[in-house]
Structure formats: structure tokens, C-alpha cells
């Protein structure tokens, strides 16, 4: 398939505002796709280069892309920067500069194919080591050298994961169902269990509903975690799960999925980052302590202070997880324990449709606990709010966040936030917000992004809604660190205002929530303060407007 056909589809999607019309267009396009590229096309339409389970990324930010565009179009860096500031989009910048280019005789005239683009993106993602930046640039420039202006717009946007077509995974799910006449629920389930929208599209096309039913969990193909809703107290949480539930300590660590295919063990974060190399102690302990060949287990990696027995600050754990060099040295400095709480797959058997009580039993059967290395999360099964409250207070005394209350009969629903699992924490809830923009500072803060625009998802997780700006309470050192982080995510610039690729999540606390027409959500956070950057969360994990409304109602009642 010619990439130009896909670029035309992207452009049409960009112009359409109706979700129903987008679904219809995508369905029609997928039906016309050759079988050998339908998986790639489905991923590309969903603004993905790789399946959700695949932790690879291209490693190309906006700074590097500006250099690529300059070289590929024979422009200067300043020409690219000025045009980008005017257009607010590097894709449009590349398109405009290619239209101006007069050296067409030097270009490779072969048309770009969708399969070639996918292969080149794979090569870019695999480049590492000395000279990696230059090699990534060369590969990306190779695509742009053969691209027509419109193709360049979308190649650049794809590489930056910023397609701007208003299409999300759920949109493509519906389109797959419509295109191939299969059940939407089967498509959703197959996607949940495979974390691979491309695979789902190909199976729907070639094997229909029968093939979709066969898609299941597989070790080394990590899935999105099941998510918890918040409850105000343990009494409310127990009531939500039917009066009796499993109460577990909510550890202050990083949620991980541990996979074994019988030959090797790998560890993934909730954002599907492969952190196996950084946690050799967990890998070794799991090999010794789990009596099964193939498995998928869930747990919390916790950095413990050996002197106090209490958890170290979360940022220290992140330092350990993100470390790429001198692993043995940092392993001694920051020892990590694995506390397991769920079992999703054992030796060929998927357990996602099994009640939680049975999954916990299987976990207890296969795990031999070893103090300080691999343990089961402490649990009590109770219908007594007083007993649950005692567990809650003990968790806080131990330095942890609170408790989880789980429905004993609940199956496991990947990527879904529901009331089958609830979290109870001691203070006014914080919000996990996607950072979508910022403002360059003035005076002493010139050269630093001084405030950040926060957003949450709408009910359908289709659009981001603004809820306020955070800037107070951050010293210059923090602002320097954040500015460095966000500079490469700038996708639009107008005066002092910038817009970011929605990738980073801030956890913020605040004094109050008020109704306000100032922001697109209709609400404004009063005196928000940054608690931490949630490196363990992706933008899709941020909170929704429903949580904002609930907190607003609770605040109203207190007033």
C-alpha cells in the first residue's frame, strides 16, 4: 500500500469532527487494506508505531526533528524554528519547506510504501550506542527525502506521536468491528488481552469472531493493568464490594508485571517499560521463589530502608529503576523488594476470567516467600469495617499509602478503572493531570517554563479538558529540570505560550475546586501545587472529569 493513501486518510480524519464519521472512514479504509499491512495500518491510524505491549519507541523529540527537517529540506535551523513558531506544528513545517524545495532532481523518486515506513521506524527504534543520534537522523531523513509534502507532514507527526487526527484506540476498535462485521465486545476483549490493536485488526479480517475468541494472554506480551477507583474510607469501600472483601496494604512503590516464558524472566512497569536490566535482584529472586515455568504476576517493587524497615521515597525507587549503568552499585545502595498481589497466567492457563479469591490462591500456591526479596502483599479478608480500619492505620504507620479493598469475586479487567478494586488514602485526594502546555517565564525566570497547563480526560477519554495551571511552590532547580524535560515535547509555540505533546503526568494537590468558565472543563483547581512527576504513569492513566466532579461535590458538602 502506498503511504500517500494513508496520508490522504489522515488528512480527511483531521478535517472531520464527528466521531461517528471518523469510525466510518477508518472502517472503509481498513476493508480496502491488503492483508499484509492491515495490522500496521490499524496501529498507524491509532497514532501508534508499535503494539501496546512493545516497549520500543523511536527516541526522536522535537529538537532532533527540527534538525532532521532542516537537513532534509536544505533549510537552516533558524528557518525551521521561525516557521515552526508561526505554524505551531513540525509536521506542517516539514510540509511547507518541502513545497519550497527546488532540488527535486536529487531526490529518490520511488513512492513510499506503508511497509517501508514501518520497517524504517523499527530500525530507528533499534538504534543505540555511540553515534545513535546521527544514525536515527539519517534514517528519518531517508524517509523525508522520498516524501511528498503531505506525506512529510504525517511522517513527522507519526515519529513524534502527535498525529492530530482526533483518533484514539477506542475509535479504531469500533472501526475494526464495523469493517469486518464482528462484535465490538469481542474486539475490545481481544485488544485488552493482547495489547495489540494491529493483531486484532488482522485476526478480525482473516479469522473473524472465531479468531478473536482465541486471542488470550501470552507471557512477554505485557497488558495494561486493572485500575482502582478511590473510596473515601474503608467502610465505603467494603460496601462497594458487597460488604466483604480482601483488604491489602497499598504499598508506596512501583507497580510491575513479572513475565516468564519458561526461559527468561522480564519485568515491566505499568507503562509497559521493560526494566529487567535495572532489577536483576528481582529477576533472580523470582526464578528461585516461583514454582512455575510460564507465568504473569503482578506486584509492587518497593525500595526499603534497611535501617528503619520503611519504604524509601518514591523518587529514589525511580532512580533505581531508570538506572542504565552501574546497576550492581546502585543495587547495593537501594535494595528493592517485590510484593506480589495478583496472578494472571500460570503454565498455559489464563486466569483473567477467574475470581480474585482464586487468583490469590494460585499465587499462594506457586510463590515461596523469601523475606526481603519476594513476598505476598499482606491481606485480610473481612466484612468488619473496624478490622479494615486497623489494617489501614497499620499501613500508614509502616510508611505506606493506605489500603486496597478488592472484590473477591471480581475477574481481571486490563486497562479498566472500576469499583471491583478500590483504594483508600488518608488525605484529600490528589489529581493525576496531563501537562498540555506552559508559559515561558519573565525576569529572573526568563528561559524557564514557569507555569504548566493541566488537563484531565473527558468521560470517554477522547479529549483533554483544562483544569488549571500550576507554577507556585517550585524552586528554580525544579523549573530547570522540568524545562529541560518539556523543551523536547513542544509541538506549538505562540509568544510566551507553548503547547506540549501530552506525555507527562503531574500529581497535584490543591486547596479547593471551583466552577469556572476559564478552563474547558468548567472547573478550576485553586492553589494547585506539584506533588511529583508521575514517571510511572502514561497520559492515558491520568484522571477523568468524573473524578473532578466527585471531589467538587464532596468539597461542596464539607462547606
UniProtKB/Swiss-Prot annotation:
- Pfam families noted in UniProt: DNA_ligase_A_C, DNA_ligase_A_M, DNA_ligase_A_N
> Which reaction is this enzyme known to catalyze?
ATP + (deoxyribonucleotide)n-3'-hydroxyl + 5'-phospho-(deoxyribonucleotide)m = (deoxyribonucleotide)n+m + AMP + diphosphate
Which GO-annotated molecular functions does the record name?
A: ATP binding; DNA binding; DNA ligase (ATP) activity; metal ion binding
Q: Record's SUPFAM superfamilies?
A: ATP-dependent DNA ligase DNA-binding domain, DNA ligase/mRNA capping enzyme, catalytic domain, Nucleic acid-binding proteins
Kindly report, in one word, the top-level EC class recorded for this enzyme.
ligase
Q: Which family does it belong to?
A: Belongs to the ATP-dependent DNA ligase family.
Q: What is this protein called?
A: DNA ligase
Q: Which organism is it from?
A: Methanopyrus kandleri (strain AV19 / DSM 6324 / JCM 9639 / NBRC 100938)
Amino acid at each position: 500500500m502506498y503511504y500517500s493513501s494513508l496520508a490522504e486518510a489522515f488528512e480527511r480524519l483531521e478535517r472531520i469532527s464527528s466521531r461517528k464519521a471518523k469510525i466510518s472512514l477508518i472502517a472503509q479504509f481498513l476493508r480496502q487494506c491488503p492483508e499484509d499491512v492491515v495490522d500496521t495500518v490499524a496501529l498507524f491510524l491509532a497514532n501508534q508505531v508499535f503494539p501496546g505491549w512493545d516497549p520500543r519507541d523511536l527516541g526522536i523529540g522535537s529538537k532532533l526533528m527540527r534538525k532532521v527537517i532542516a537537513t532534509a529540506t536544505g533549510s537552516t535551523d533558524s528557518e525551521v524554528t521561525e516557521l515552526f513558531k508561526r505554524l505551531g506544528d513540525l509536521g506542517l513545517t516539514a510540509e511547507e519547506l518541502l513545497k519550497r524545495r527546488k532540488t527535486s532532481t536529487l531526490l529518490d523518486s520511488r513512492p513510499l510504501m506503508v511497509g517501508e515506513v514501518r520497517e524504517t521506524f523499527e530500525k530507528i527504534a533499534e538504534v543505540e550506542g555511540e553515534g545513535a543520534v546521527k544514525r536515527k537522523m539519517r534514517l528519518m531523513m531517508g524517509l523525508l527525502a522520498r516524501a511528498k509534502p503531505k506525506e512529510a507532514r504525517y511522517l513527522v507527526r507519526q515519529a513524534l506521536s502527535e498525529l492530530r487526527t482526533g483518533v484514539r484506540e477506542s475509535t479504531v476498535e469500533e472501526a475494526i468491528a464495523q469493517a469486518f462485521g464482528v462484535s465490538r465486545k469481542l474486539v475490545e476483549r481481544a485488544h485488552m488481552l493482547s495489547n495489540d490493536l494491529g493483531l486484532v485488526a488482522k485476526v478480525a479480517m482473516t479469522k473473524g469472531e472465531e479468531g478473536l475468541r482465541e486471542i488470550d494472554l501470552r507471557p512477554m506480551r505485557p497488558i495494561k493493568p486493572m485500575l482502582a477507583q478511590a473510596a473515601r474510607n474503608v467502610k465505603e469501600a467494603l460496601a462497594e464490594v458487597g460488604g466483604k472483601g480482601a483488604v491489602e496494604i497499598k504499598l508506596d512503590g512501583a507497580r510491575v508485571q513479572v513475565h516468564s516464558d519458561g526461559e527468561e524472566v522480564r519485568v515491566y512497569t505499568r507503562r509497559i517499560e521493560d526494566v529487567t536490566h535495572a532489577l536483576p535482584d528481582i529477576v533472580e529472586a523470582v526464578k528461585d521463589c516461583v514454582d512455575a515455568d510460564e507465568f504473569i504476576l503482578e506486584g509492587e517493587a518497593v525500595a526499603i530502608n534497611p535501617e528503619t524497615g520503611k519504604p524509601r521515597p518514591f523518587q529514589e525507587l525511580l532512580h533505581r529503576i531508570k538506572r542504565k549503568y552501574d546497576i550492581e552499585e546502585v543495587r547495593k545502595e537501594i535494595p528493592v523488594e517485590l510484593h506480589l498481589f495478583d496472578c494472571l497466567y500460570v503454565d498455559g492457563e489464563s486466569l483473567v476470567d477467574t475470581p480474585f479469591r482464586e487468583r490469590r490462591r494460585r499465587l499462594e500456591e506457586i510463590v515461596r516467600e523469601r523475606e526481603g526479596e519476594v513476598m505476598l502483599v499482606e491481606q485480610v479478608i473481612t466484612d468488619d469495617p473496624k478490622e479494615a480500619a486497623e489494617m489501614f492505620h497499620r499501613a500508614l504507620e509502616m510508611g505506606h499509602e493506605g489500603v486496597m479493598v478488592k472484590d473477591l469475586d471480581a475477574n481481571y479487567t486490563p486497562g479498566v478503572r472500576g469499583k471491583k478494586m478500590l483504594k483508600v488514602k488518608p488525605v484529600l485526594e490528589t489529581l493525576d493531570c496531563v501537562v498540555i502546555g506552559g508559559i515561558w517565564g519573565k525576569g529572573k525566570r526568563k528561559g524557564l517554563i514557569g507555569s504548566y497547563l493541566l488537563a484531565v480526560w473527558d468521560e470517554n477519554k477522547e479529549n483533554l479538558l483544562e483544569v488549571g495551571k500550576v507554577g507556585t511552590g517550585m524552586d528554580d532547580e525544579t523549573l530547570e529540570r522540568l524545562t529541560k524535560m518539556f523543551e523536547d515535547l513542544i509541538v506549538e509555540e505562540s509568544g510566551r505560550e507553548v503547547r506540549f505533546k501530552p506525555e507527562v503526568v503531574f500529581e497535584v494537590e490543591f486547596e479547593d475546586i471551583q466552577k469556572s468558565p476559564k478552563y474547558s472543563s468548567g472547573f478550576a483547581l485553586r492553589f494547585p501545587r506539584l506533588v511529583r512527576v508521575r514517571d510511572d504513569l502514561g497520559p492515558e492513566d491520568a484522571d477523568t472529569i468524573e473524578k473532578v466532579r466527585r471531589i467538587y461535590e464532596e468539597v461542596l458538602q464539607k462547606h
